Every structure is written in C-alpha cells, then in structure tokens.
A protein has these predicted regions:
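Activation-segment/catalytic-loop signature of the eukaryotic protein kinase fold
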Residues: 39
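C-terminal lobe helix-coil module of Hanks-type protein kinase domains
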Residues: 86, 105, 137-235
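Protein kinase catalytic-loop region centered on the HRD/HxD motif
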Residues: 84-94
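Activation segment signature within eukaryotic-like protein kinase domains
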Residues: 78-79
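AlphaC helix of the protein kinase catalytic domain
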Residues: 58-70
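Conserved short submotifs of the Hanks-type protein kinase catalytic core
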Residues: 43-57
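AlphaC helix of the eukaryotic protein kinase fold
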Residues: 5-27
Length: 236
C-alpha cells in the first residue's frame, strides 16, 4: 500500500479535500483506477491508505523513452484503459477533472491506472458538476472559466494527454490560465499531421473534435472517443 498523511498544522481545507478525495475514490472499484483502501482522522492527523503502484507515471515514462513520446500501440493501450476507467467513473456520477500525465500510472506489467480523484465531484441529479481547478494546460475552457462541466471536460483533458503522448509536446501549455485559453481557442500552432504525417487521419479528426473549445462539439462519451482512436492506432 501507499500511505499519504498530514500532520498537525495542516490547513483544514487540505484535510477536507483529501477526505473528499478518499470518499469519492472509495466508491470506484475498477482495475484501471488506483484503489483507496481507507481514510481516517486521528486527533491532529489524517491519512489515506492507497494502492501502491509499482511503476512510473506517464510524465516519468515520457521523460525516459526515446523522442519523448509513445508508440501508436502503447498510446492505444493507454487510451483504451483510461477510457474504461473514466466510463466507469462517469456511470457512477463521478468526474475526474484533473487528468494529466502525473495522474496516469503504468505498473511493471503494463497496466494503466488513473490516480488522484481529488478534483472529482459527485454529479448532481442532472448529471453535471461544478467546475473546480484542475491543471493549467489540460483543463477545457469551461473548467478554466468556472462554468458547469460534465463528462466532456474529461474527454478534452484525455485528448490533451493523448496528443502529448503521441508527440511529446503539450500544445496548450501556458504560464497562466489565460495563456492556455488563448492556445485552446486559437488551436495548435502546428497541426498534428505536420508533427507526425503518419498519424492516421481518423485519429487526427477524433482529436480535433475532442479538443474543441465548445463542449457540444466533442464526442458524447469517453468510450465513443476511445473507439475512434484505438482501432486506427492499431488496437492494443
């Protein structure tokens, strides 16, 4: 297991957020989601007991591989796994809202697991959750701007991660949220097919749709997005 703890003097909001994360994650039992086993408060201390993943996160992996990007087969496997995790979460009314390379774990057997549901919100009866801060460069416009979000926010973030995994570059990275928003609305300076002419056209089209600034233009579900990506990249 992995133990994450907070001692005396830790801001109450930090502990509250951690416990909210644990309660949310405990609802999600899935082979592609990092398991939270327990969460407790004892006096001035709070701790989470989580599954230990023996491996690397995607950011660490990209830093080690030649060229800083994944093969098509590796990317297909990653997206297939993450889509299953997210679809399960979405079906249970949970949004992730902070999908990024450091929250994607790959163990020594090649199993991909999504970690840190700290930004996750339980959706309302209408299926929507209030936007909360994720990570600049991976958040869609509606989340950056504090508007209502739904599953399509996670689709956008997943697409940003995939594009980065295929090219080694996050085209929406910015020093500020405003700078990142500008990149999103203007679109990537270098089209994907110019960065890698061998990328299947269907993958480029699916990414373009998923990265639309307008949520209604994106795919309707994370599984729909994965289906458009995995087969053209060569299945798993």
């Amino acid at each position: 297991v992995s133990l994450q703890g907070w001692g005396a003097g830790v801001l109450a909001s930090t502990v509250d957020e951690a416990l909210s994360e644990a309660r949310t994650a405990c609802l999600l039992a899935h082979p592609n989601i990092v398991t939270v086993h327990d969460f407790e408060i004892e006096g001035d201390y709070a701790y989470l007991v989580m599954e230990f993943v023996d491996g690397l996160n995607l950011s660490e992996l990209l830093a080690r591989v030649e060229g800083g990007y994944l093969t098509y087969a590796e990317a297909a496997h990653m997206i297939s796994s993450l889509a299953k995790a997210l679809q399960y979460a979405h079906e249970n009314g949970v949004l992730h809202l902070d999908i990024k390379p450091t929250n994607i774990m790959i163990d020594r057997q090649g199993t991909v697991k999504l970690a840190d549901f700290g930004m996750a919100t339980l959706a309302s009866a209408a299926g929507y959750g209030g936007a909360r801060g994720g990570t600049v460069g991976y958040m869609p416009p509606e989340q950056v701007e504090g508007m209502l979000v739904d599953e399509r926010a996670d689709i956008f973030s997943l697409a940003v991660v995939l594009r980065q995994a295929l090219t080694g570059v996050n085209v929406f990275a910015g020093r500020t949220a405003k700078e990142s928003l500008d990149h999103i609305y203007k679109g990537p300076k270098i089209p994907l097919l110019k960065q890698d002419p061998e990328v299947p056209f269907a993958v480029d089209a699916a990414l373009t749709q998923a990265l639309s600034p307008e949520p209604s233009m994106r795919q309707g579900s994370v599984l729909e997005f994965a289906q458009e990506i995995v087969a053209p990249l060569g299945n798993e």
